[in-house]
């Protein structure tokens, strides 16, 4: 949760946006804008949910976490930790990179994180090979709630057959080779979506959600 101490700490780290605008992966990004929020995902065994006639919005196909421990705040160069985490999640889901049709990125709007994640996504899936979105342009980083919020966004994207745009971003930094969704929602044929959350201290998490 946001509080004065947290804001002061992030401010001293120069992690907060001086413009007050969260614009993930944008060439003009200058830091994040603290957010608050919550999301609840109800998880149930497939057979049990089917038996009781539940309305299924998505299926968890796989997940993984690791700890690069490169630096207490900075990501590992080239997104090495993120690369390993996404590949572990793919292996857990028994999927190949070509099976992923959307990346719900961690995308905090900080110069270092976004550059590292873009490099990692390009390495794992290929340059510009898969649509990328960060919902933090709307929510900002909600700290402990970020993963649940973004997983919920991924489920809703599948349910509505629309990839939301990355708010406030007009296009990716020219140094990045990613297909960033901007401007308007993009229709798509829902399929496996990887949702990333990469935190301080090099701890990384990736989950893969698919249509039910």
Regions from the language model: what does each represent?
Residues 70-82, 108-125, 142-149:
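Short glycine/threonine-rich loop-to-helix capping motif typified by GTGT followed
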Residues 8-19, 77-81, 116-128, 210-212:
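A glycine- and small-aliphatic-rich helix-loop capping segment at beta-alpha/alpha-beta transitions
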Residues 16, 65-66, 109, 175:
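Active-site/binding-pocket entry motifs
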């Amino acid at each position: 949760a946001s509080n004065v101490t947290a804001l002061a700490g992030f401010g001293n780290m120069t992690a907060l946006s001086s413009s007050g605008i969260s614009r993930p992966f944008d060439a003009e990004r200058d830091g994040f804008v603290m957010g608050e929020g919550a999301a609840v995902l109800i998880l149930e065994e497939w057979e049990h949910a089917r038996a009781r006639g539940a309305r299924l919005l998505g299926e968890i196909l796989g997940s993984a976490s690791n700890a690069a421990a490169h630096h207490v705040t900075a990501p590992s160069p080239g997104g090495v930790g993120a690369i390993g985490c996404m590949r572990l999640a793919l292996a857990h889901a028994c999927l190949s990179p070509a099976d992923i049709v959307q990346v719900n990125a961690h995308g905090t709007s900080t110069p270092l994180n976004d550059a590292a994640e873009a490099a990692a996504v390009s390495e794992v899936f290929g340059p510009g090979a898969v649509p990328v979105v960060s919902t933090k342009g709307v929510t900002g980083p909600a700290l402990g709630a970020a993963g649940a919020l973004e997983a919920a966004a991924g489920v809703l994207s599948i349910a509505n057959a629309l990839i939301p745009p990355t708010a406030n971003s007009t296009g990716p930094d020219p140094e990045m080779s990613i297909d960033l969704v901007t401007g308007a929602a993009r229709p798509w044929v829902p399929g496996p979506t990887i949702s990333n959350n990469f935190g301080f201290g090099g701890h990384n998490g990736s989950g893969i959600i698919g249509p039910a």
